[in-house]
Amino acid sequence: MIMKHLKIKIMSIAFMAVTTSSMAQSLNKMNWLNEPQQWEIKDGKTLVMDVPAKTDFWRISHYGFTVDDGPFYYATYGGEFEAKVKITGNYVTTFDQMGLMLRIDHENWIKAGVEYVDGKQNVSAVVT
């Protein structure tokens, strides 16, 4: 896949997450897919959100389901870019997660972050 010719959406998904970014992109100019009911931007650089239960991004899994309903806060980029975020959260339920997603469309994306499984925070990645 040649990424430099594609427009990619980048976001942070989170459960009770706080995402801080020092990138030039203003959080106030980003867009939502599946906007959660409760969210806010603090000090122009920190995104805080409450993610609805049982929402996620998962594609044709061995579990037998596909979902595309998690909160997705993104900016669209073409060509090369750099992303840097700090994530913290209140992990409570198995599969609570937060991180970054590079997304072309509902069938083509990569998400990487931290996921709560078996009472522990684990590094997690899903590639479609």
Write out the residue ranges for each language-model feature.
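Extracellular glycan-recognition regions
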Residues: Q25-T128
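Bacterial Sec-dependent N-terminal signal peptides
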Residues: M1-S26
